[in-house]
Amino acid sequence: MKCFILAAALVLAFACIAASEPAETENEDLDDLSDLEDEEWLDELEEAAEYLESLREFEESRGYKDYMSKAKDLYKDIKKDKRVKAVMKSSYMKEAKKLYKDNPVRDAYQVYKGVKAGGKLLFG
């Protein structure tokens, strides 16, 4: 009996929600824009989107520079050891170099991780 009452209450609630009118928004003035104003507004949105995209690319390139400088510093440290030749010939370092040549911004972190992993292999 309790399940029946609960099911009926849920059906009634969904029926009320479906039949209700949508609430009016506070941005009613947007509905009254002319076509010219609409185009200007869309142009501004497009410019803002382009600006945000350029910021994202800048952040990626800045991150790339950080990771590459860390990788170079780490590489200089481990290069002093004679065992480095074995690490540099290993497959993961070759793959990291290939990734870097293919897409330096996206895969700089992978290069950094590869060099860091090489240092861990050498020095434990």
Swiss-Prot record:
The keyword Transcription does not apply. GO terms for cellular component: extracellular region. One of its GO terms (biological process) is defense response to bacterium. It is found in: Secreted. It comes from the Eukaryota. Pfam families: Latarcin. Expressed by the venom gland. InterPro entries: Latarcin_precursor. This is Cytoinsectotoxin-4. The lineage of its organism: Eukaryota, Metazoa, Ecdysozoa, Arthropoda, Chelicerata.
